[in-house]
């Protein structure tokens, strides 16, 4: 068996991000790095995330640099992974007309994943915070095996 690894192209990275809905967000917290799974939607140069008020949000406001990883694993040597590095922004509809427009766009984008988000029937009503991550750097890898 021959195992090969290669970098994914920018288009392949975007395709994997578009095909996934759960990623792992890594961020600095009390002299360590924490990582948490969460739902996201990719849209252009941005990832839109939804969370609740708490420790993660408090830390992200003070240390906005994050990484988000998504992957598609079919076997030990049959997988693809994308890592996005960027800065996170808290979206607040009270930040004037531009803030309201960013919030409305984020909610509409997130509703592609969860149609009832921020509406009657919302499956996670306690998650009232919308964030977006600017995809400053995106890279991906793929492993594959062949019987050569």
Describe the function of each predicted region.
Residues 10, 22, 65, 135:
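ATP/adenylate-binding site constellation spanning eukaryotic-like Ser/Thr protein kinases
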Residues 43-44, 56-59, 99:
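A short local loop/turn or secondary-structure capping micro-motif enriched for an aromatic residue
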Residues 49-79:
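Helix-adjacent hinge/juxtasegments
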Residues 2, 72-148:
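Charged, gly/pro-rich active-site loop segments
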């Amino acid at each position: 068996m021959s195992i090969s690894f290669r970098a994914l192209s920018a288009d392949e990275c975007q395709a994997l991000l578009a095909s996934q809905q759960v990623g792992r967000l890594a961020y600095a917290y009390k002299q360590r790095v924490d990582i948490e799974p969460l739902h996201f939607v990719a849209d252009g140069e941005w990832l839109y995330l939804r969370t609740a008020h708490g420790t993660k949000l408090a830390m992200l406001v003070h240390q906005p640099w994050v990484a988000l990883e998504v992957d598609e694993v079919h076997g030990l040597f049959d997988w693809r992974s994308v890592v996005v590095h960027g800065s996170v922004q808290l979206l607040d509809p009270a930040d004037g007309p531009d803030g309201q427009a960013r919030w409305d766009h984020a909610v509409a984008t997130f509703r592609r994943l969860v149609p009832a988000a921020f509406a009657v029937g919302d499956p996670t009503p306690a998650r009232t915070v919308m964030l977006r991550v600017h995809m400053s750097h995106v890279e991906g890898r793929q492993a594959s095996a062949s019987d050569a």
